[in-house]
Curated annotation (Swiss-Prot):
Family per similarity comment: Belongs to the glucose-6-phosphate dehydrogenase family.
Protein name in UniProt: Glucose-6-phosphate 1-dehydrogenase, chloroplastic
Binding-site residues, D-glucose 6-phosphate: 230, 260-264, 298, 317, 418, 423, 459
Enzyme class name: oxidoreductase
Gene Ontology CC annotation, any one: chloroplast stroma
Amino acid sequence: MEELVSCHHLPLLCLQSSVPPNGCLTFFQDSACQRCSHSEFSNGHPLNDVSLQNDVAVNPIVAKSIDPSADLQLLPLLESVKEEPTLSIIVVGASGDLAKKKIFPALFALFYENCLPENFTVFGFSRTEMNDEELRTMISKTLTCRIDQRENCGEKMDHFLQRCFYHSGQYNSEDDFSGLDCKLKEKEAGRLQNRLFYLSIPPNIFVDVVRCVSHRASSASGWTRVIVEKPFGRDSDSSRELTRSFKQYLSEDQIFRIDHYLGKELVENLSVLRFSNLVFEPLWSRNYIRNVQLIFSEDFGTEGRGGYFDNYGIIRDIMQNHLLQILALFAMETPVSLDAEDIRNEKVKVLRSMKPLKLQDVVVGQYKGHSKGNKSYSGYTDDPTVPNNSVTPTFAAAALFIDNARWDGVPFLMKAGKALHTKRAEIRVQFRHVPGNLYKKTFGTDLDKATNELVLRVQPDEAIYLKINNKVPGLGMRLDRTDLNLCYSTRYRGEIPDAYERLLLDAIEGERRLFIRSDKLDAAWSLFTPLLKELEEKKVAPELYPYGSRGPVGAHYLAAKHNVRWGDLSGEDS
């Protein structure tokens, strides 16, 4: 329900029964009051409980004939109309790791910062048998007042937990979702219902849950939105089929496909850095940028998740979504506005300007066992949940190109891997050499020192730094490369919000800028599907690399093929 218009602070009353076709009747003292649309407020549902309170007549009423004293009889009803809508957040898959480690803590952080509406409840739904108190005990183990150390932290935590409830059921049972709906209505108490469902479940049961939500648990008077976690299919065909199935039950604006990397602080800051600083925007093209590197590395392997990971691999898990979405944000043209659709339109244009990846532009690897000191690290296929003959890549590097006037000829290099020497995620922009550089003899043949580089470190230790050439103090002429460094932990006090906090708040507010639209998803899959099919059909053997190393040697040859050196492998960044 939209907010009711008022005249002299007297709210409108919209009665559905026997209402003239041109809209709802308005109680007014001023002829300037406007009518409200009948469909806007009723949402097509029968007369609601609020309208039936206090024996209010439902026959046509002529506004001008109302006795002013009748206003007193309507005050309880008018007060109920003014109540804030309820917000019900339903975490489907509440007993899973993602819900416990990320979703519930993010919701508590939003509550802690007073970002949730007054009338909110959180419901957990899963197959696990549990009651409300058991859910609260489970949630409480992962909640922390990490933002700061206010004295009322414990009190806030207790208040949040009292808003948390649980309903057990099967994901494909409409009856179980009807039971959930009854519990939701009990908490909503006849007020306007807004419902947000977070699907923290395996993708093979997405459609069952969406069907049950649509048929039995959607809001009768407000909005219903569904957040969907990746993976969104395995290739173009399965992704399109998933989207088609969703749209049998939901409209596109109800579907919030989440990629939590787009909620990272440094990724969010990327467009601000570019479009609000004159020093960068003129340089953002092939004229000044030599290459762009998007790097994701983890210093641990699959460790127990091998069975799940083996079905997808590093390309589907990281490159096709996280890194490609960041690339689109980095390379897009200036949008008309900051409106969600304007930004998403520009990102889709970037993806459609790219050619599908070919096998010769990709290197795949898989980590093997390695001993370091007195400690031994198991290889990928040593995991008991992984087939011994698996060729699923745990590392991939790729070179992509954008065929448009801004980026023609600029290689965009992606690299993602597990069990590497460090954990990091960053965007590295290497600029071209200075034409006719007066100091080139001082640099010698060291390519690194001759190149300016802008680095956005997404994690850990968020930072933005620009590598520049500088004279070392002294009598001689010796040049050194140094950093102009913005380290977030030094410059800004307080902890940076988690990506899930930002994205959950955006979904609640209906802000879609950081969520993935269906056409963008389709464009992303079209780039990687031919490559994935070729890898699987030919059973391409990945290059082995030791656990804890810098990855397969082939990645260096791929970069050298495009006259690039990986920026994260220089001595100063190791």
